[in-house]
Structures are given as structure tokens and as C-alpha cells.
Amino acid sequence: MAIKSILCIEDDRFIGEMYVRSLHNAGYDVDWVVDGHDGLVAARNKDYDLILLDIMLPEMRGTEILETLRGGEDDLIPNSKIIVLTNFEQDDESRLAMEHNADAYLIKAEITPRKLLEAIAELEAAPPQQG
């Protein structure tokens, strides 16, 4: 799966700017929103190849967004991959996110621009999931 369009849902301005700058420099088309509600609206209104989803967000938690998009009978974003972004302290949240059909998760404290691009490349190379 070729990834071209990315939605970044991240409320930390410094981190969000780093992701967006790195992704733009790598040739991706990136939209960035800073709260959960706007993230959910954006994910529903545009067909993104990848969503970078922070767990701790204002307005709506990342796990709620994931549950809304993929937790029901229908996958509302069947053509999108999701990488959950989490902190060390949120191990249970990471597990919960993966149970709700996230495609991968990254520990925010360990993410560098290079590691982010490597994680995206791994998703691009992965075989399609059978649903």
C-alpha cells in the first residue's frame, strides 16, 4: 500500500510541527489537527492513507476516535492505516488501541523523524490485512 496522504492528530505543537515538517520533506501530503473532535471529523471527511493518532487529546481521547472509526461492525476508514502515538505511562492504552484495530503504535519519547518514516515504510511494505 502506497502511503501519500497523512492525517496527524497531535495536540503538542512542538511534536506536531516536527512530524509535519519531516513528513512534508519526505514528500507526503499532511493535514494536522490539534484536538480529538477535529481529528474525528477530518478522518471521516477525507480518505487518508495513514492517520497518526495521539492517545491523549483534548475534546476526545485517541482511543475514543479509534473505537468510533473501527470499533463497530463497520470499519469507517477501511483504506486508512492508523499508527497510535503514546507515552510510556500508557501501556494499557497502547494494548487497548491495538485491540481496537490500530495498525501499529509508537512510543512518543522514542520517535525521531527517521523512526517515524521507518514505521511508515514498514506499513507500506506490510501485506494487506484480511478482514
List each model region and its residues:
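Conserved acidic carboxylate
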Residues: 10
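Charged docking surfaces used in two-component/phosphorelay signaling
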Residues: 17-25
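Short hydrophobic/Thr-rich beta-strand motif most characteristic of the beta2 strand and flanking loop
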Residues: 27-34, 42
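Acidic catalytic/metal-coordinating carboxylates
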Residues: 35-38, 61-67
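Active-site residues of response regulator receiver
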Residues: 54, 86
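The feature encodes the CheY-like receiver
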Residues: 58, 90
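Short amphipathic alpha-helix used as the core "switch/output" element in two-component signaling
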Residues: 63-77
